[in-house]
Each structure stands twice: as C-alpha cells, then as structure tokens.
C-alpha cells in the first residue's frame, strides 16, 4: 500500500486512555481502531499489537508507550496507550506523549479503583484539559440501578479532583463486544458505543491553541558574539513566532529584572528569515546586548509572558534503581540539579508534612527552591539529575513565590 499523505485539513488532537489495570484501556483502543477502520478512518490494530508497546525515552526515562492514529469526520487523533501503571505515571509526568484530553476507562462491575483515582489526580496535576469517561463491561451488569450508582460515584470522584463531574460525558458500552464482533457493518449494535464515545470526544475535548499562536518563547541554548554585529542567541522556538523589530525579554538565571531588547535579525541555517515560528531552530541577533549579558538556561520571550521564579510545587516521579535511578531514599533538604529546558540549576527539595523520605519508584508532591530564579510556569516539565544522570522527572503544579 502506498504511503498516504498526511492531510492537514482537520484539527489534530492528542488523546490517551487512562484508568485502572484490567479495566479495558487497551481493548478499547483496539476497538476504536477496528470500528473506525470500517469506514477507512483508521488502520485496525489488534490488542496484542497495542499491548506489546515499544519503549521510548523521555527526559532520561524509559517508558513503554503505544501510539495509534485515527480520524473522525471532524478531527485527526493521535492516541496513546501504555501497558503498565508505572508507564502511565511516567508518561503523564514527563509529558512524553502530550494529552489534549483523556479517555478514562472504568469497568462498570468494579467501579472506581485506586489507579482510577491516581490517574484522575495526575490528570489534574499535569493539567490535562478534559476527560471523557467510557464505562466499560456494562454487558456484565444486570442491574441498571447499580450502573447509575457507579456513574454517580465517578462524577463525585471527578468533581473532587477539580474536573466538572456533572458535565463530563459518560458513555456506556463493552469494548470487548465491539472488538470481537464479526460484523462488517458500522451500524451494528455492538459498535454503537464506540461511535458514541468518539462523538463525545469530538464534542467535549476542546481544540488546543496551536503553539504558534501562543506568546513567543525560545529557550537559549547557545550565545555567540559576532564582530561588528552584536550578540546572537540560538535555540529552538518553543511557541509563538519572532521577527525582526520585535521587542523581547531575556528571563531567568539572575536576580536582576528581565532585560528588554530588540531582535535585529533572525537566521536559520545561515539564511535570513522573515520570521521564525514554533519548532524552528533559529539564531536571533539582539540589539545592545553584550556576549556576557546572556547565557544558556535563560529564555527569550514576548515581554511579560513568563516570569522568573525560585520556589514551586511539583509532582515528581523518582526513578527506581532498575531504571538507573538512586539506590537509596532521599530526605527533605536533598539538593540535586533540576534540568529545566536547557540547563541544570541546583535546588533544595522540601517534602510534605508527615513524609519522612522518598523511596526510588515513588510518585510524590514536593516543594522545590532553586538557587537562582528561572523562567517557570505551571505545566512545565523538568528532570532531576545527580552527577549528570537522571534520578527523577517532574512537572510544575504551582508557583509559590
């Protein structure tokens, strides 16, 4: 089969399945590809293909993760499914596969379980914008009143963790019946729940603002002085766009207020550009800035769009020994390096009240105080390193200064 061209005609959305082990996340993922393949909008992927997920590395951490893609009439989706519970935690904290929305799979006979709660909490912490629920295995429930109770419990749980529990769509069905049905007719009754779910995902999960439409930000990777022209900073534009004549700020790595300057040139591969946009690797020539005024680890950004901070709260996953992490626990006051965007900054860790220590393999909320302010915002991912090796991964959940 010839490779199909990637059509940019539809908005592109990243989703993923979350929920307790054995509640049917992978079965549902396979069922979605099967049902949508009946109208040529996906390639069917069997359960085993999805379950046997390849490993990826993100921020120094190995994660098993399976990507599938499919389309609805309205959108193009990239969907992630992880085989193990630890893989989910690692994926959500490192943002290896970004989620614009999540499909929470709950087995109706079991109701919400510990990992259901943990995944909802994590989704809130890492700011997954929206959740749609698939209430699975309803064919195993005879009592409609029990189903109502499970739904009620789920809505309360979602509200407790800061999601709009009363509004969230809950679709009932059986992923296995859809997956195992021999029917080639997309209107077969077993497929109705999958189409209903995709409709809910289409309608309820908002289209994210594209990176290029957000305020300009570029982490500085390198600084050069060019004789007779001034100082050039290079990096990959994280969001927004930049063109000659734009006023920008240099933020972080100093206790002084951010410096303002004007971009007098934008280059890519030694060629001048009209404008650099999100995803481009560029060099920006800055007016009136000395080579010694800028350093790696700072960011170049739209004025006022991001502030430097020292103190924040973060959700952190600490690597196990087998993953190349620490062999021993650490305590409050532990001072590793925090790799934020392009550089390491030393900081001290504070543990929550009543928590003595953190063991390798733990997933915890902690406060972090850096020795210098850095451009930070909620949702920013970082790695924790010790002697150059990654010992943890985190995401900023709250700014504290």
Swiss-Prot record:
Keyword Thylakoid annotated: no
Main location: cytoplasm
Reaction equation(s) it catalyzes: GTP + H2O = GDP + phosphate + H(+)
Ligand binding (Mg(2+)): 26
UniProt region (G3), positions on chain: 81-84
Origin: domain of life: Bacteria
Region span, G1: 19-26
Region of interest (G4), residue spans: 136-139
Binding-site positions, GTP: 19-26, 81-85, 136-139
GO BP of this protein: translational elongation
Subcellular location: Cytoplasm
Residue ranges of the region described as G2: 60-64
Keyword Lipoprotein belongs to the record: no
Domain tr-type G: 10-209
Single GO molecular function: GTP binding
Keywords: Cytoplasm, Elongation factor, GTP-binding, Hydrolase, Magnesium, Metal-binding, Nucleotide-binding, Protein biosynthesis
GO CC entries: cytoplasm
Assembly notes: Monomer.
NCBIfam families: EF-Tu, PRK00049.1, PRK12735.1, PRK12736.1, small_GTP
Similarity section: Belongs to the TRAFAC class translation factor GTPase superfamily. Classic translation factor GTPase family. EF-Tu/EF-1A subfamily.
Task performed by this protein: GTP hydrolase that promotes the GTP-dependent binding of aminoacyl-tRNA to the A-site of ribosomes during protein biosynthesis.
Name listed for the protein in its UniProt record: Elongation factor Tu
Species this protein is from: Chloroflexus aurantiacus (strain ATCC 29366 / DSM 635 / J-10-fl)
Lineage: Bacteria, Bacillati, Chloroflexota, Chloroflexia, Chloroflexales
């Amino acid at each position: 089969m010839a490779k199909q061209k990637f059509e940019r005609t539809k908005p592109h959305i990243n989703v993923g399945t979350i929920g307790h082990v054995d509640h049917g996340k992978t079965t549902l993922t396979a069922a979605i590809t099967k049902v949508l393949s009946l109208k040529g909008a996906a390639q069917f992927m069997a359960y085993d293909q999805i379950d046997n997920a390849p490993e990826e590395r993100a921020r120094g951490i190995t994660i098993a993760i399976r990507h599938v893609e499919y389309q609805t009439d309205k959108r193009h989706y990239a969907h992630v499914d992880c085989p193990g519970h630890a893989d989910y935690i690692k994926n959500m904290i490192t943002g290896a596969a970004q989620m614009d929305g999540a499909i929470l799979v709950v087995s109706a006979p079991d109701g919400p379980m510990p990992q259901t709660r943990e995944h909802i909490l994590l989704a809130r912490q890492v700011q997954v914008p929206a959740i749609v629920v698939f209430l699975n295995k309803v064919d195993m429930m005879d009592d409609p009143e029990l189903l109502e109770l499970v739904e009620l419990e789920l809505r309360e749980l979602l509200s407790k963790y800061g999601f709009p529990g009363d509004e969230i769509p809950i679709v009932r069905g059986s992923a296995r019946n859809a997956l195992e049905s021999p029917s080639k007719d997309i209107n077969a009754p077993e497929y109705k729940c999958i189409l209903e779910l995709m409709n809910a995902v289409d309608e309820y999960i908002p289209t994210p603002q594209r990176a290029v439409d957000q305020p300009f930000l570029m982490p500085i990777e390198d600084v050069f002085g060019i004789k007779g022209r001034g100082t050039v900073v290079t990096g990959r534009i994280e969001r927004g766009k930049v063109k000659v004549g734009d006023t920008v700020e240099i933020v972080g790595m100093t206790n002084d207020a951010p410096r303002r300057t004007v971009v007098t040139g934008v280059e890519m591969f030694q060629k001048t550009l009209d404008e650099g946009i999100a995803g481009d690797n560029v060099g920006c020539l800055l007016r009136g800035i000395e080579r010694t005024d800028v350093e790696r680890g700072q960011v170049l950004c739209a004025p006022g769009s991001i502030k430097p901070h020292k103190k924040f709260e973060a959700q952190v996953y600490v690597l196990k020994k087998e993953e190349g992490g620490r062999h021993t626990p650490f305590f409050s006051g532990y001072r590793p390096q925090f790799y934020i965007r392009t550089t390491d900054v030393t900081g001290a860790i504070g543990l929550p009240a009543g928590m003595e220590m953190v063991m390798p393999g733990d997933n915890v909320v902690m406060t972090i105080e850096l020795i210098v302010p850095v451009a930070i915002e909620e949702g920013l991912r970082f790695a924790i390193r010790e002697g150059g090796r990654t010992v943890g991964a985190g995401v900023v959940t709250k700014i504290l200064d």
